[in-house]
Curated annotation (Swiss-Prot):
Gene giving rise to this polypeptide: hslO
Subcellular location: Cytoplasm
GO cellular component labels: cytoplasm
Keywords tagged on the record: Chaperone, Cytoplasm, Disulfide bond, Redox-active center, Zinc
Protein name: 33 kDa chaperonin
Length: 288
């Protein structure tokens, strides 16, 4: 199993935790979207978060979407995940080039800058659940911590990291989400808060070769950690010519007529994976 998510509990089920390794998923996204290192890190962090938040969904057909709209040069990010470990995503501007930040790290916060994080959960109900918060730092992990606290009222610790190699490929990628359940004893809360301040960053843990299980062991080993589930995860786009055709057929007759009048076949690319689909003039005429 290459990329996978582990789910766990600790402190007599007062703590629930998720951790993921996502190197191949993020490398696939990098290759599909030809992202620069800073955008590989930005999209990679959100893909890791999406994978874990997808694993929180209970229904077979549940879908979660994480959207960031921002004022920085990245312009925005979108990630969609299901409850089976299938994740896809894209950056509005995958070609952002920025100098390293003051700490000598890839400047994800600079690429995103100010903005809004929106989480949409489609659980097959009439209306999807939607929660929103402002970006606190643009570094994504802190923004999600803030989202969980304000929109879902769940005290959480989120850690996300992507290591980019000298050749711009993904060296390591992963993360964790640790959440406190209601009525967690105060001493457990205090001990966990202290522990979170003492641990290495996710990138340091990944660079040491730690697996998701070992990352959770490092954080929750003193809390009676119990791994409850392991799920494979991957970058997977479910686009098809039929789906793209359905999207095209929603264009107005005027717009379709204009495309047809050009007399040439058109190429439409999937935003999530960059796969190109060609439609002939005859195919376009059938959509009117």
């Amino acid at each position: 199993m290459s990329d996978y998510i582990v789910r766990a509990t600790a402190a007599d089920a007062n703590i629930r935790a998720f951790a993921v390794t996502s190197k191949e998923m993020v490398e696939n996204a990098r290759e599909d979207h030809m992202t620069t290192p800073v955008m590989t890190a930005a999209l990679g962090r959100l893909l890791s978060a999406g994978a874990m938040m997808g694993a929180m969904m209970k229904g077979d057909k549940d879908i979660i979407t994480l959207q960031i709209q921002c004022s920085g040069p990245a312009k925005g990010l979108t990630v969609t995940a299901d409850s089976h470990g299938n994740v896809k995503g894209f950056a509005m501007n995958p070609q952002v080039e920025l100098p390293l930040n003051a700490a000598g790290k890839l400047d994800v916060g600079g690429a995103l800058d100010l903005g809004i994080l929106t989480v949409i959960k489609d659980m097959g109900l009439k209306e999807p659940y939607s929660g929103q918060c402002e970006l606190k730092t643009g570094e994504i992990a802190e923004d999600l911590t803030y989202y969980f606290a304000t929109s879902e009222q769940i005290p959480s610790a989120v850690g996300l990291g992507v290591l980019v190699d000298k050749d711009q490929s993904v060296k390591q990628s992963g993360g964790f989400i640790i959440q406190l359940m209601p009525f967690t004893p105060e001493d457990v809360v205090d001990r966990l808060e202290k522990k979170i301040t003492e641990i290495d960053s996710v990138t340091q843990m990944l660079d040491r070769g730690l697996t998701p299980e070992q990352i959770l062991e490092e954080i929750l080993g003193d809390f009676g950690l119990e791994i409850t589930d392991t799920t494979e995860t991957r970058f997977h786009c479910d686009c098809s010519k039929e789906r793209v055709s359905r999207a095209l057929s929603t264009l107005s007759k005027k717009d379709l007529d204009s495309i047809i009048a050009d007399g040439e076949s058109i190429e439409v690319k999937c935003q999530f994976c960059n796969k190109a689909y060609e439609f002939t003039v005859d195919e376009l005429k059938e959509m009117r």
